[in-house]
Amino acid sequence: MGCFECCIKCLGGVPYASLLATILCFSGVALFCGCGHVALTKVERIVQLYFSNNASDHVLLTDVIQMMHYVIYGVASFSFLYGIILLAEGFYTTSAVKEIHGEFKTTVCGRCISGMSVFLTYLLGIAWLGVFGFSAVPAFIYYNMWSACQTISSPPVNLTTVIEEICVDVRQYGIIPWNASPGKACGSTLTTICNTSEFDLSYHLFIVACAGAGATVIALLIYMMATTYNFAVLKFKSREDCCTKF
């Protein structure tokens, strides 16, 4: 066998679907964790400066943000490790299915690992779908604030409300308790918040974090299809003495 044929045979064992999913997963997790971490820090500062004068009112928010920072560290570490494991499993199953190294060979342990990877990937897909929905919440809150600021800076002709009565109350979102003071920002104060670099940066970071979570969901969907297909073929070929290739 020549060098060219050997290279073609080796390239045939590359799990391109798993490789694409791994790159997409790493990118999505990096965007979600990195942008989410910085955005949460900016949220804490905005609340302390403009919505809560008493430190005891936002102490719970501070603790929650600190806890979410640690959760982000754990999610990033686990996702990167699991992505590498799935990529390695993809190389194993692709080589076995395509019989790269001779006739079809697999073990009960190998099929068990493939089945477990399918199960875990489905669970992670559902979990990340929830994370994607959850990450859209702060982006929605920021969009409401931005829309209110746009109304203040460029009021429509048919506006009947006084500019100073246009407010955003973060207490209704559960960010701080109802007895927090002032708890809301109105008129010129709200415009000042929207013009700060913290608001602009955190708004865009939350959008990017949401997009990163969406990319991770897509990556896990690709993983689901690849691992399910590989597991089905392994199970089929281990039971039947056939030469059919899908």
From Swiss-Prot:
Keywords: Membrane, Transmembrane, Transmembrane helix
Family: Belongs to the myelin proteolipid protein family.
Membrane topology qualifier: Multi-pass membrane protein
Entry GO CC: membrane raft; myelin sheath; plasma membrane
Keyword match Transmembrane helix: yes
MF terms (GO), sorted A to Z: structural constituent of myelin sheath
Organism: Squalus acanthias (Spiny dogfish)
Localization terms from the record: Membrane
Protein name (record): Proteolipid protein DM gamma
One Pfam match: Myelin_PLP
Coiled-coil ranges per UniProt: none
Tissue: Highly expressed in white matter in myelinating shark brain.
Disulfide links within the chain: none
Keyword Membrane included in the entry's annotation: yes
SMART domains on file: PLP (SM00002)
Cross-referenced InterPro entries: Myelin_PLP, Myelin_PLP_CS
Transmembrane segments: 19-35, 71-87, 118-134, 206-222
Swiss-Prot/TrEMBL GO biological process terms: axon development; central nervous system myelination; negative regulation of serotonin uptake
